[in-house]
A protein has these predicted regions:
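Bacterial N-terminal signal peptides that target proteins for export
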Residues: 1-9
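Short stretches within intrinsically disordered, low-complexity N-terminal or propeptide regions
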Residues: 9-10, 21
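Hydrophobic alpha-helical segments of integral membrane proteins
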Residues: 12-15
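N-terminal signal peptide c-region/cleavage motif recognized by signal peptidases
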Residues: 17-19
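Alpha/propeptide regions of enzymes that mature by internal proteolysis
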Residues: 23-430
Length: 430
């Protein structure tokens, strides 16, 4: 997991940073932290944004109102001077740091990071992640004198979920997390193989003073933009057959200056320019961050396993189904040229339509009594797409209907595979 209250650096790393970084005195107007060779990404009259190694820190030069999910100093504050995004471990196979994580509570982790940076823990808002800080995305949007800047890291490989998905964990009054599944059936993972690429961290800075409600509205807009990005990329939930809206450990920090000469903005509505800037900046930053961290980009979604994986389509299942429906010769050809099927744009278009129909049926937008006919119609289009022979749609539909009578209809994914096999066979039967 990459959530901040479990993320930690142990004593070995603390010694490493203590030896590497020299202490510096703090000056309120000139933020300092223990970087010996930082890269300054942005510096202006309001803040300095710097990165070194596994740390990204925004040091505020003037008082700011900060809204954050930080486990310590979280919520709304006017006493936070440092905004930190920290990589606490590698995304995969980091056994040592994974074990160190689960031994520290929220306060201990927060204090450890503050000590490494040589800054007061009470002046820091913190986000933790397993994403590579070097893959940090940065986007700024302007309108007249208004500026919105977003820094983001993002990973969704293992932890993507849709709001309301079933969960395994609950917490006691003392905050200890406990599985709500019986021990015999609770999922277990080896920390040697656990994939922790699952946190979206957003750090958003506005150059204008905001009333508290407007700042909270920005958090809403940022969440909406995040969900929109995952929908654009068709990122699947790992807990349900639906498109994800985020991950289980997403975090955010929003900062805006206070006590400025201009009156605070009273609203950050999506109907206002500030709302547009927030939404577009978050969207672009997350698209960039997901590309660099997970190599997820729009073209990545043109892949049958990506499109229908949330419904159970895998390479193994596809090959088994093709072998069932094709002759030995035709199957051998399909197996050797599988990429020409799974990456074909026309076939993926038909698959997207098929997945959307499955969603509509699950959401109750379409009558369940018509499900078989609805899926048969689109499955025939899948055969058309694979074969590139649209005039044979009626023939494809009838063949699929004959083998999928209501009392013996295939599962939706198996019907899709049968349609692919039929299309592949027809492609070469001139």
């Amino acid at each position: 997991m990459t959530n901040p209250w479990r993320a930690a650096i142990g004593s070995l790393l603390l010694l490493e940073f203590s030896a590497t970084f020299a202490a510096t005195e703090l000056e309120p107007s000139e933020p300092r932290f223990a970087f010996d060779a930082p890269t300054t990404l942005v510096e202006n009259s309001l803040y300095r944004a710097q990165r070194q190694g596994r740390f990204f820190v925004v040091g505020l030069k003037k008082p700011h109102q900060v809204l954050s999910t930080s486990a310590v100093n979280g919520g709304q504050s006017t006493t936070v001077d440092y905004l930190v995004n920290h990589q606490s471990m590698e995304a995969r196979g980091d056994h040592l740091r994974y074990m160190q994580q689960i031994t520290l509570d929220r306060q201990q982790y927060h204090q450890t990071v503050a000590d490494q940076l040589r800054i007061p823990s009470q002046a820091m808002a913190l986000m933790g992640t397993a994403a590579n800080i070097q893959n940090l995305a940065m986007v700024e949007k302007h309108f007249k004198g208004l500026s919105v800047r977003v820094f983001a890291t993002a990973g969704v490989r293992s932890n993507a979920q849709r709001a309301g998905d079933p969960t395994e964990w609950y917490q006691h009054n003392d905050g200890v997390m406990v599985s709500n599944k019986p021990i015999a059936t609770a999922q277990t993972k080896s920390s040697l193989t656990t994939d922790n690429q699952g946190t979206i961290n957003i750090l958003l800075l506005v150059n204008r003073e905001l009333v508290p409600g407007a700042q909270t509205k920005i958090a809403v807009l940022a969440s909406e933009a995040k969900a929109a990005v995952l929908a654009e990329l068709m990122v699947s939930s790992k807990s349900s057959p639906f498109v994800a809206t985020g991950t289980g450990t997403d975090q955010i920090i929003i900062a805006s200056p206070i006590a400025t000469e201009s009156p605070p903005l009273p609203s950050a509505s999506g109907h206002l320019k500030i709302g547009e800037l927030v939404g577009s900046a978050v969207r672009e930053a997350l698209l960039d961050a997901l590309n660099w961290q997970n190599r997820i980009q729009p073209s990545s979604a043109a892949n049958l396993f990506y499109v229908l994986g949330r419904f159970g389509l895998t390479e193994e299942r596809l090959l088994e189904g093709l072998q069932l429906h094709l002759s030995t010769v035709d199957f051998g050809l399909a197996e050797q040229n599988l990429n020409s099927i799974i990456f074909d744009s026309r076939t993926n278009a038909a698959a997207y339509a098929y997945s959307e129909l499955l969603d509509r049926l699950q959401f109750g937008n379409l009558s369940p009594t018509a499900a078989l006919e609805i899926l048969l119609d689109q499955a025939a289009q899948v055969s058309v797409a694979v074969s590139a022979k649209p005039l044979r749609w009626p023939e494809f539909w009838k063949a699929l209907a004959d083998t999928n009578a209501s009392e013996q209809a295939n599962e939706p994914v198996d019907l899709f595979i049968e349609a692919v096999a039929q299309g592949w066979q027809a492609k070469w039967d001139d």
